[in-house]
Each structure stands twice: as C-alpha cells, then as structure tokens.
Amino acid sequence: MLGVFSALEVAASGLSAERVRMNTIASNLANVRTTRTPEGGPYRRIDPVFEAVGLDQLQGFPQLQRGVSLVRVSRVVEDKRPGTMVYEPGHPDANADGYVEYPNVNAVEEMVNMITASRAYEAGITSIDTVKQMAHSALEIGR
C-alpha cells in the first residue's frame, strides 16, 4: 500500500521533472534566433529525457508495492535536426554563400510543449492537494 509520504514523493518527483522540462523549453525559446554560441554554430534545441524509477528500488522503501515509480530526468539531450538556412549575405554569421543557419527551434512546437508541461505540473499539484485532503480526512476519522 502506498503511504501518504510516498504518494507525495511520487507527485513531487513529477513536479521536479516538469520544472526541468519548462526550463529547457524556456532556454529553447530564448535562443530561437541565436546564430552563434560559445561552442560555435547556432543554438541547438535541447530536450530532457525522463526515466521511471520504481520506489521498491530506492533505499528506505522496501515495503512498497511494485509498479509505483518516481520520475527522474536521466539526461538532457541535444536535438540533432538541422537548423534553418536563410539567405542573409550581410549577416555576420553568413557562410561563403551568404546563408545563415538559424537554430532548429520551432517556436510553435515549444509553445505546445510549454502548455503540455504546464498542464502536467497542474495535475501534479492537484494530486498533492488530493493526498493532503485524504490525509486530513483520515485524521478526522481517527478522532
């Protein structure tokens, strides 16, 4: 059986993962027109990769049922899709043919991702509120 604190831990892990996703989306949107980075070349879109970690695998949770998982960000990866080439011969980052490579960030796609992450975060908050209400109700019954 999943206890109150374990349920809160699961929900909190989801909130933390969505916060990382929102931060990467913000970085992508902030760099949508960055044609030169310190590493050289245009900014490359980044994406977090999530993994499920079973609570039964974590130290201190041996009594929990299998199948309950925390969410963790295992890594942040760079999107390998090519950027957009735009003919701008006067641009300082133009190549010999006059083309500038812009980041592989699609602002509309990022906005959709932001809405999805925001809704997932809201769902996590709702689950925490529900767990708190259940714990409160259980305490009231015990009185």
Give, region by region, the residue ranges found by the protein language model.
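Amphipathic alpha-helical polymerization modules
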Residues: M1-R143
